[in-house]
Amino acid sequence: LGIEIDSLVLDAGYVSKELIGAFHIGTEKTIIGRMPARKGYPFKTLYWEVKDLIGKGKYAFVRKHHAYFGIKKKINLFEKPIYAYVYVDQYNALKRFSDYLVDHEDEYAELKVKDKDWYTVKYGYFVLVSNIDTSPKDLLSDYFGRTDIEVVFKTAKEYLDLLPLSKWTDSTV
């Protein structure tokens, strides 16, 4: 088909050591990916590094009626330089934390103070990794733009009764 990919926007399940090796600061093609919350990734370590900044006005912005905390940090991931954009969707964090407290009040009371702090942001906390040097607000907008594109393709696919992109040939294009 002659399609060349020069930019990727991916969910956490697709971010891997191999991908970071191919797309890091200094590489030509760009990537935005959601960092998985699993072993080998500094997901929670980044929270501990920025936790005292969460709630500070300097790092706050609004996107689609949600208040966000966002900060960019240059890190090494799998020995490659990359930007980690650390976010808290404060609306989701507060709403889901409140729901958690209603259902788990006794469990919460038993937690250590530092763990209680984590639970106040846990349900809105996420990290994006990218080789793009921009503001946290702009990168988040680019990341969520992916969902808008997915909706367009899904709607067009259903409306036109198209095959998935992976099954397209020169003649179907």
Regions from the PLM with identified roles:
Residues 1-173:
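Anion-binding and metal-coordination hotspots
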